[in-house]
Amino acid sequence: MNDKKELKLILVAARNQLSSNDIKCLIAYLESDDCEFETSLQISEPKEQPELLELHRLVAIPALIKVSPAPKQIFAGSNIFSQLQKWLPRWSQEGLTKNLGINLQPSKIDSTRTQKEFLLEDELLVLRQENETLTKRIESQERLLRMVAHELRTPLTAATLAVQSQKLGQIDISKLQEVIKRRLEEIELLSQDLLEVGTTKWEALFNPQKIDLGNISAEVILELEKFWRIRNIEIDTDIPSDLPSVFADQRRMRQVFLNLIENAIKFSKDSGSIKITMIHKTNQWVEITICDKGAGIPLSEQKRIFLDRVRLPQTSEGTSGFGIGLSVCRRIVQVHGGRIWVVSEVGVGSCFHFTVPVWQGQNKEQQNLTKG
């Protein structure tokens, strides 16, 4: 005779989230004999059952909902299994006291407290946990929205420059149409990213493949030509002809180059120079360096500039400080398994370095670089 207490749960998760270690361990445990409950687990995908999000007021997934026994509880985040493990013994104890017919009355030692107060304490604890999870999720979504919004500026700026160039007779109408078409495709991809904000991690939106960093940097330099030519800034490149291809998301790598080269132009003096270097330091990494001879960054600020929501004060020339762009660069590079840093001296200039994994065939190890 099975005397296990029944436990009804609903797991709300996107398809790609089901492959995370936390969710795999959760499902395996609930299906195993080690679980002290007779568990009924319903797995639902939010795209197929969006009404669950509203019904249970979910703003974060994956989420595990305890439907019965009452009261309802919700666990969300990247550590659902560990959260559940903390509560299982308590639920088991609650079930035991009920099955034995024990009437939980206030004790003589603490006669001023009622059973309702204890239940309220439990509910308050659950609410605090949910609030903490929701706060983290909201912060994550805000960060992602800022990044996507920042990326959206790139194709819009490129399209605007193309229109201006066509008006000045620098490009013909067919070239303008080609540029506009390509930028609209980029905007379409970004809009898809925005739709995925609530259901997946930003890292999961990456599409790593075999790409040529030399070509990407050349495209970005050409795209920003109007900005560096008008200020008579010289851009030199040192890219070996035998530089290997890398394993990265082409659109995201382009964003890194655009942000860093745009910053280098922005902080360079008129008639200044920028140097872009790429070297194959090891069998696994390509290191890219972008140097300018601008105002430089104080040592105390060199780590902070890569953080979210950090903007340095204006320089003496009145140029606005680094904004969200460097935070975007950091996250993109880290998702690829690389690192980014700056070497700078006030009054001399700055060199931004970052590494990207070499293409060695699309094996599992490299695919895992993009899984946060």
UniProtKB/Swiss-Prot annotation:
Residue(s) carrying Phosphohistidine: H150
Purpose: Member of the two-component regulatory system SasA/RpaA involved in genome-wide circadian gene expression. One of several clock output pathways. Participates in the Kai clock protein complex, the main circadian regulator in cyanobacteria, via its interaction with KaiC. KaiC enhances the autophosphorylation activity of SasA, which then transfers its phosphate group to RpaA to activate it. In addition to its output function, recruits fold-shifted KaiB (KaiB(fs)) to KaiC to cooperatively form the KaiB(6):KaiC(6) complex (independent of SasA kinase activity).
Record protein name field: Adaptive-response sensory kinase SasA
Record comment regarding domains: The N-terminus interacts with KaiC, while the C-terminal histidine kinase domain autophosphorylates and is probably responsible for self-oligomerization. The N-terminal domain stimulates the C-terminus to autophosphorylate.
Record's keyword terms, sorted: ATP-binding, Biological rhythms, Kinase, Nucleotide-binding, Phosphoprotein, Transferase, Two-component regulatory system
Keyword Transport: no
EC number, as in UniProt: 2.7.13.3
Catalytically driven reaction(s): ATP + protein L-histidine = ADP + protein N-phospho-L-histidine
Domain Histidine kinase: 147-360
Keyword Metal-binding: no
Assembly information from the UniProt record: Homooligomerizes. Interacts with KaiC. Participates in the KaiBC complex, whose core is composed of a KaiC homohexamer and 6 KaiB.
Domain of life: Bacteria
GO biological process, one term: circadian rhythm
GO molecular function, one term: phosphorelay response regulator activity
Enzyme class per UniProt: transferase
Coiled coil: none
Database matches in SMART domains: HATPase_c, HisKA, KaiB
